[in-house]
Every structure is written in structure tokens, then in C-alpha cells.
């Protein structure tokens, strides 16, 4: 029988998020919680000890990519066949693990990634499921009862990584740290002919950013309201994706078009314009010159100044 594990990443979790972990223990074949908070969270340690849940403290080394790598390596060492990735705020439907276990059993010992449809609760709409020929993008028409559908990109939340896929694709890129980590992995899968599938029967609710709608005359604009640090990582890593994959897959330039749209959003409707636009500018520059890794390494003075402001 196919064994399906779950990997949950914590980062300054709330009490409610910690309490929710207890329900995961019997839903999957193996549960590993990675505490990615810089200093070990005593509440997480106590809760996991009480519930008999395996806990690994990783301390945000390598960002979200590092946490995924540490957790996946540990679970695959325990001979788990496939692992589902989750954020601490993921709301997992009861049908998720039985359905994904059937998907894994059907695909057998093959390299693959599979994920549910993602319903963005902020936008009250599904994220678009896309296919690509490397040059253009095409939106897929997904029917709820349809079989597995090949796609080009999956976000990490709810995504199942098979053991063979991890063997073929390797570790997530820790130099990216956070934003576009899953986008890069999708491009890597595309380049190595590892299939990605969306499971039409499964829907995972998810909140992306702190979206707000703004009226500008007769028009409406949506803003994400990410911090300047996230703007930095997003812009920098988008440049890296374009440089790394753009010649083979011109569609890898698209994340940079999203950066341009972020500039428009910030300039028109968001607060902290100066800091966010500066973050994007620094990110583009560092992406072009290959300065990767955490902000503390690439822009230590900027990171230190932000830390002082945060501490008051």
C-alpha cells in the first residue's frame, strides 16, 4: 500500500494553528512538523510531545525551501512513498488524504507532483490552472469530476511530492529563500519531464496575501499588501527565474511582468510606497547580479535597519 506522509511548516504559529495539528496525526501515515521559527517555539514542542507528533526545529535556515528540504529528507528516510506539503494555516478537507492516497497508488512508483485546486478565499475564486508549451500559457478548463489533469505549475501548499520526484528533481532551491520557490520547482520539473497533476475533485482553501479591493473611478484594482521584504524576494527571484529558464522556456519571463504590475499596484493604492518600491528595486538589482539567499546576507544594512525599526 502507498504510504502518504504530511509535512507542516510552522513560523510563529498561533495557538489555534498549533491546536489544529492534533487532527492531522491520524489522517496520514506519518506526520512531521518543522518549526521554522528562528528560536524553538516552546508551545509547539509541548503540543507535539503531548500528541506524539514528530517535531524538527529548523530555525528558518534556507527559508521555506530549507524547511521543505529538511522535512522531505527526514520523511523519505523513513521510507514514506510520497509527502504532502502544508502551511500552518492550511485548512485540509477530510477527503484530501484518501483521495491523494488513491492518486499516489494509481501513479505507482513514478516521479510526479500532484496538487488540489486552490480556492483563494481572499479573492473568492480559484487560482488559474495553467499549461504551457514553454512559450505561452493556456488556462485549463477543470470540471470537478474529471480525472487527473496535467498542468504546468503547482503552489507548494497541498502539493504532494513523490519519493521518485524528489530523487529526480533534488532539493528545493534554498538560495531563493521564500517567494517563487514552488515556481522554480515547477520549471525544474518541466525541464526534466517530471509530470505535474491537478486533482479536480480536491479543493484546498487558501489565503494569498492580505488582498484588498480599491475603487479608482469606474475601475477596481486588487492589492496584495505584502511587506517590502516580500516584495524584495519576489522581484529578485522573478529575475532569477527569467535568467535561469528564460532561454529554454520564454514563459519564465512572466513572473517579471507580475513584478511590473506590483509596481503599479503599490504606486496607486498601497501604503509604505517608498519602502516597497525600494525593495523591488533592490530585488531586481540583486537578481541581475546573482546575489541570492536571505536578506540578512544580501542586504545586511537594510535588514539591520528594518530590525531596529521593528524593535522600536
Question: What is each PLM-predicted segment?
Answer:
Residues 159, 165, 169-170, 175-202:
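A short, conserved alpha-helix in the catalytic core of glycosyltransferases
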Residues 243-312:
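Non-catalytic, C-terminal membrane-associated alpha-helical segments of glycosyltransferases
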Residues 95-128:
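Conserved donor NDP-sugar-binding/catalytic core segment of glycosyltransferases
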Residues 22-57:
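Acidic donor-binding segment of Leloir-type glycosyltransferases
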Residues 80-91:
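Short beta-strand-to-loop acidic/aromatic patch adjacent to the donor-nucleotide binding site
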Residues 58-75:
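Glycine-rich, basic loop-to-helix element that forms the pyrophosphate-binding segment
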Residues 7-27:
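Short, well-formed alpha-helical segments that are part of the catalytic scaffolds
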Residues 117, 132-152:
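Short, flexible, basic/aromatic active-site loop/helix in glycosyltransferases
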